[in-house]
């Protein structure tokens, strides 16, 4: 019988380089995380810069799932979802992408991406807009399908093969121009975005949203592009899926240092404490801490007496680890 896989907790935005969150880091008191880091061993480090389209937590999740290495911005999240839901058959060579409805926030000097998770779209609105959008996408050879998440569609087209796109978690709050795909291959997509902006402006759905006091949906963001080959699919599917804890995300993206620190305290008392309890009971556990620039994976490994003794005096380790992310 195969050995059980470790319980793996993956925490995006565990470290954050934005001013308020970075200042809040010094105030954190995370006793359960401190104890976990004393008892676990650093097994893997992934450090890049914060200009990568694929953020550290997405790269860490792809590794944990057993997906093969991909070029920056080309982790095939959409193709993986299409395969799991049955939209893509085994052996399907087509490329897929995630189309996420969003609010582009128009400023004096630039247009920034608002967080799609804040637009409060329901399934009926998502399906109504999908029906309107499909003919426009089809003109460019892109087939659109609904997903289980309102406001997010699966798109299938050859244009997505090798097209690097930025994760929403990279782009939120920043100028669209900073993270939009460039080059000749993306020109049809930029034109399609312009067409969709004009189309969405006239939709009854947005009139009703305005009456409710929620942000209008005025564009879409493309991400998760790529091809999933048969040999790339984890086997068995989902067997190595870590628990992805998103409690820190919203505060981190807003650079709300107080809320981020409060979320960390609650996380330490909740999911982190639970992982520590599992470890204490003898379970095989793993912890991935991810920030803007890097991710670190901690696992259960045999430790010699010297390393154990050193750990007893390394009481600032949690803050140091989070700061390094």
Locate the predicted segments by residue.
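Internal, conserved structured core segments that host functional sites
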Residues: 121, 153-160
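Extended, Lys/Arg-enriched charged tracts that mediate electrostatic binding to polyanionic substrates
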Residues: 118-146, 202-219
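C-terminal regions of proteins
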Residues: 257-325
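Flexible loop/turn segments at secondary-structure boundaries
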Residues: 16-19, 217-218, 226-230, 293-298
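An N-terminal, globular interaction/scaffold subdomain
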Residues: 22-119, 123-126
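A contiguous, surface-oriented mixed alpha/beta subdomain in the mid-to-C-terminal portion of proteins
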Residues: 148-150, 159-280
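Acidic carboxylate-rich catalytic motifs and surrounding loops in phosphoryl-/glycosyl-chemistry enzymes
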Residues: 145-152, 221-222, 287-291
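N-terminal basic/disordered segments at the start of proteins
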Residues: 2-24
């Amino acid at each position: 019988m195969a050995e059980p896989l470790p319980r793996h907790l993956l925490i995006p935005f565990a470290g954050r380089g934005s001013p308020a969150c970075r200042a809040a880091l010094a105030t954190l008191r995370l006793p359960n995380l401190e104890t976990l880091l004393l008892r676990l061993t650093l097994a893997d480090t992934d450090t890049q810069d914060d200009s990568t389209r694929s953020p550290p937590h997405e790269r860490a999740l792809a590794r944990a799932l057993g997906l093969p290495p991909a070029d920056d911005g080309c982790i095939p999240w959409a193709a993986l979802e299409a395969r799991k839901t049955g939209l893509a058959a085994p052996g399907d060579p087509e490329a897929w992408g995630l189309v996420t409805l969003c609010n582009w926030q128009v400023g004096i000097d630039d247009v920034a991406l608002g967080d799609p998770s804040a637009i409060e779209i329901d399934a009926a609105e998502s399906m109504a807009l999908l029906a309107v959008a499909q003919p426009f996408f089809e003109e460019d050879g892109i087939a659109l399908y609904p997903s289980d998440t309102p406001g997010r569609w699966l798109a299938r087209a050859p244009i997505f093969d090798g097209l690097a796109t930025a994760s929403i978690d990279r782009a939120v709050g920043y100028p669209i121009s900073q993270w939009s795909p460039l080059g000749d291959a993306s020109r049809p997509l930029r034109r399609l975005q312009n067409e969709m902006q004009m189309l969405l402006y006239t939709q009854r759905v947005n009139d009703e949203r305005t009456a409710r006091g929620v942000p209008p949906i005025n564009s879409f963001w493309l991400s998760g592009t790529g091809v999933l080959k048969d040999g790339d699919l984890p086997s068995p599917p989902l067997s190595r899926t870590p628990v992805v804890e998103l409690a820190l995300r919203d505060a981190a993206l807003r650079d709300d240092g107080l809320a981020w620190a409060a979320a960390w305290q609650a996380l330490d008392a909740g999911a982190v404490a639970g992982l520590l309890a599992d470890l204490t009971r003898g379970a095989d556990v793993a912890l991935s801490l991810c920030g803007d620039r890097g991710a670190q994976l901690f696992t259960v490994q045999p430790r010699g007496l010297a390393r154990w003794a050193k750990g007893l005096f390394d009481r600032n380790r949690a803050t140091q680890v989070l700061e390094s992310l």
